[in-house]
Amino acid sequence: MTNIRKTHPLFKIVSHSFIDLPAPSNISAWWNFGSLLGLCLAIQILTGLFLAMHYTSDTMTAFSSVSHICRDVNYGWLIRYMHANGASMFFICLFLHVGRGLYYGSYTYLETWNIGVILLFAVMATAFMGYVLPWGQMSFWGATVITNLLSAIPYIGTTLVEWIWGGFSVDKATLTRFFAFHFILPFIVAALIMIHLLFLHETGSNNPSGLISDSDKIPFHPYFTIKDILGALLLILILMILVLFMPDLLGDPDNYTPANPLNTPPHIKPEWYFLFAYAILRSIPNKLGGVLALIFSILILMLFPLLHMSKQRSMTFRPLSQCLFWVLVADLLALTWIGGQPVEYPFIIIGQLASILYFSIILLMIPTVSLIENKLLKW
């Protein structure tokens, strides 16, 4: 009798995706982050569902409902902090996953890469709207500042902002719709992940050498299932250390003050994972220019396949490109730091230099160095 796993229409899909999938034998721990992102999404959807059972999306009661979850709901504090810190873990995994793709040239799988960039935007939108829901000071002012950026769009800007707000300021209508969108978006993200995997399985995974690995494939199960379980355990360990020992480490103290439209916090800043983009936005004095730079700082990822000049796919055997890659990483860390600093000397000029360096490395330096490496190889 043929194995049901290979004949049943539903089990067959699972089997082809997670059991019999031919995977390169040499993929390193950097290939673990895809499954970890799936785990993060599952944690976020589950904890979010339980939070939504007790949360009220009304300006009068939102803040106190979150307080009620933490004080009165059984293990509500645990669910709330798992959700908040789970978002941070999600973005850490996202950045490492994207970084892996850049380093090893995975962006040459065009469809997979572009869907991935769309996924990044979707997750960022979800996280932004989620940050507004507790209705603390930083929630309110963060929502006001970021949505207000759309007013930089010529002609339709102001109308667009008021349409998104559902009034003339961030208020009850804004909070209600943000809650609705925050609830639905993770499921859209899950659907996009399916498409992401569909395209990935058309080509198969890349590997650290960047070479075709058809001659040396091994089954996904048991080799990579056990490897993914190890990664998952480490992720959960780090998450639970964060949640149980330092739940507010990555949060903002201002968000423990209820939203007050009459009192602006001294330093308005988003969550830590948006700070690099926020620093790029602030480094340009012009409003529209800043918004365009902000969008392009993420959208630039889509240009990587076009800017790939090297005759090799991966950076494994390209030491000059490796140096530039790590300079880019350092630059992003510098931007993240600057994004959290007040707008004053010397932070303004550091932010501007870091922003220029960010775009220069990607648009100019990496392609140029790739061409030099081609020459050095005498190919």
Curated annotation (Swiss-Prot):
UniProt: a ubiquinone binding residues: 201
GO terms classed as biological process: mitochondrial electron transport, ubiquinol to cytochrome c
Cellular component annotations (GO), alphabetically ordered: mitochondrial inner membrane; respiratory chain complex III
Membrane topology value: Multi-pass membrane protein
Domain of life: Eukaryota
Cofactor(s), names only, from the UniProt record: heme b
Binding site for heme b b562: 83, 182
CDD domains named among the record's database cross-references: cytochrome_b_C, Cytochrome_b_N
PROSITE patterns: CYTB_CTER (PS51003), CYTB_NTER (PS51002)
Subcellular location: Mitochondrion inner membrane
Chain residues that bind heme b b566: 97, 196
Single GO MF annotation: metal ion binding
Keyword annotations from UniProtKB, A to Z: Electron transport, Heme, Iron, Membrane, Metal-binding, Mitochondrion, Mitochondrion inner membrane, Respiratory chain, Transmembrane, Transmembrane helix, Transport, Ubiquinone
Cofactor annotation comment: Binds 2 heme b groups non-covalently.
Residues that span the membrane, as ranges: 33-53, 77-98, 113-133, 178-198, 226-246, 288-308, 320-340, 347-367
Assembly behavior: The cytochrome bc1 complex contains 11 subunits: 3 respiratory subunits (MT-CYB, CYC1 and UQCRFS1), 2 core proteins (UQCRC1 and UQCRC2) and 6 low-molecular weight proteins (UQCRH/QCR6, UQCRB/QCR7, UQCRQ/QCR8, UQCR10/QCR9, UQCR11/QCR10 and a cleavage product of UQCRFS1). This cytochrome bc1 complex then forms a dimer.
Similarity-based family: Belongs to the cytochrome b family.
Function: Component of the ubiquinol-cytochrome c reductase complex (complex III or cytochrome b-c1 complex) that is part of the mitochondrial respiratory chain. The b-c1 complex mediates electron transfer from ubiquinol to cytochrome c. Contributes to the generation of a proton gradient across the mitochondrial membrane that is then used for ATP synthesis.
Protein name: Cytochrome b
Organism: Notocitellus adocetus
